[in-house]
Structure formats: C-alpha cells, structure tokens
Amino acid sequence: MSATPIIHLRDVKKRTGVLNAWERVRNKPQVHWAMECFAEALGVFFYVYFGLGSTAAWVIGNILKQSGLSSVFQIGFAYAFGILFAIGVCAATSGGHFNPCVTIAFTIFRGFPPLKAVRYIVAQILGAYIASALVYNQWKVLIVESELLLKQAGVYETTMFTPNGPAGIFALYLLPGAQTLPRAFLNEFVNCFVLALVIWAALDPTSFMIPPVMAPFIIAAAYAGSIWGYAVPAISLNSARDIGCRLFALTIWGKSAAGGSYSAITALVNIPATLLAAVVYELFLVDSDRVVAGSHLEFMNVAANHRRHRHQAEDDNHGDADDSSQEKPV
C-alpha cells in the first residue's frame, strides 16, 4: 500500500464540461498518440527555439560588429533552459525523449514500440523545423541585412554557409580550416557518449545522488557543458535539432545549405554513441542489488498509478480471472 493516498487531479480540481469532453476524446488509445507526438514536437521546439535565438544574436552581432549581443556561454545557457522547459512542460505527456537517439535507444533496450518511435522522431524533427521558421521570421530583417553586408564585403560565398554566416544560425557547418571530418566525428561521438551516460544515470532509480526532481537540471547542465567546451570545433548532440533546422535552411537557401559530408556526422553519429553509452552503463554501472531511492520509488509509483493505466490493468486482471474461472473443454 502507498504511504500516501492516491489522489488524481480530477479528484481535487473540476474542469468545465467542454474540457472534460475533450479529454475523453483525446485520451482514447486511437488518438492519444497524437498528443504524445505533440508533446515531443513542443519539447524540441523549446530546446531549438531558445538555442537558435541566442545563436542568431551571436552570429548577427559579429557580422554587424555589435558586441555583447550573445556569446558561446549564453548559447549554452539558452539550450540548457530550453531543455528544462521541454522536460518540465512536456515530459509528463510523452515521456520526454526530445531526441531521436534517445527514442531509438529506448526502442532497443526498453521495449519502446517501433511504430511509436517513428512517430516520435517525425514529431521531433517537425518541432525543430517550426522553431527554425519562427526564429528566422523574428530575425529576418537583421538576417537579410547581414547577407547584404557580406555581399558588399565580398565574403558572402566564403562566410554564408559556415558557423559565422546567417545560414549557420540554423544548419551546422564546419569552421573552415579549423576542423577535419575525422576530428569532427570524434568530437561529436565523445560528447554524445558522455551526454548519454548522464541521461542513463538520471533515469537509474538507484541513483540516489540524482533524484527525479534534479534530473532535468543534470541533463541540461550536461548539454550546456558540451556546448561551452566543444561548440566551436563543431557539435550537434541532437538529430532532430540538426535535421529539422537543416531542412529549414534548405527551404530558405536551397542546396547550398546542405552542409556536405559533415551533415551526415551531425545527423547520425549521436545514434551509435548513445547506443554504446547505454550498453556501457547497463554492463558496468547498473547494480540490481542497490536499493531504489525513495524519491525514485515515489516517481515510479506516480507513473504506475496514472488513472487510465490503473483501470486498464484492472480490466486486464479481471479478464484473466474470468478466463481462468471458465472450465476449458477437454
């Protein structure tokens, strides 16, 4: 028996008839997957929207010679806050993947349904695309002004599709002369591997040093740390952020914004890195004899006692009991 009574929101807060009717419709199994996908898209939107906005200030400020508009430090914080908002607002509905590599890892290691995984990944990429479109339109006047300034200076071709050009606000590019593809691969792989270890640790119910309420901050700090240390050599960390934003850059600037071979690194390397990190954590760091921390147990009980889940489980149990009580023909 739970140490505290199980009280659902509807027990203490009454909603209007319209909202109750809408909840009954949206929570049907045939429809609820769309709500989960909406939450995944919205979560990635938060992450990308705040990160790109800060990146736009950095890139445009440098082109227009306006100092103090942004910095790598600020960009790291912007992405970190976006992650906090994503987890805080959306994770209760979808589970809080917000990254295709996390969804793929959950599918392989934790039985996440493959069809649902495909839907999640599409939603994540869509969220990044929508965020890119909004950031572009909010910054459009200054982006166009920056492009004109680059053309007047005769450096448009050499700057536009680099981290220092307006297209670099959205799509990820190698810094010319500063990075090779093998080193970019190493940079991406190591950072994604470390980040995935942190995520897996935050999800470990025996991690008493990382209670559930702190997990969003730990994960956000890991993202920020990677950006602060390795954004300049070039880093992606999230396929949805990369693919969604690159598709938007292609929408605006055409094939020139594709990014060449480096785009494969930014879009794909985080997937094997995350899978390897999950294997390493499961093999070397998980200990089934450790005690489940009280805060994690409470979190697990809250998830398990979701009203619809409990009713479904009770219906299944009644069905099993009815089946077992019937005499089977010999």
Curated annotation (Swiss-Prot):
InterPro entries tied to this protein: Aquaporin-like, MIP, MIP/Aquaporin
Motif NPA 2, residue range(s) on this chain: 238-240
Membrane disposition: Multi-pass membrane protein
GO molecular function: glycerol channel activity; water channel activity
Pfam families named among the record's database cross-references: MIP
Keywords noted in UniProt: Membrane, Repeat, Transmembrane, Transmembrane helix, Transport
Domain of life of the organism encoding this protein: Eukaryota
Short sequence motif named NPA 1, residue ranges: 99-101
Gene3D superfamilies documented for this protein: Glycerol uptake facilitator protein
Ranges where the record places region Disordered: 308-330
Extracellular side: 62-71, 146-157, 205-207, 286-330
Signals that turn on the gene: Expression is induced 2-fold during ectomycorrhiza formation.
Sequence ranges on the Cytoplasmic membrane side: 1-40, 93-124, 179-183, 229-264
Family, similarity comment: Belongs to the MIP/aquaporin (TC 1.A.8) family.
Protein name (record): Aquaporin Lacbi1:307192
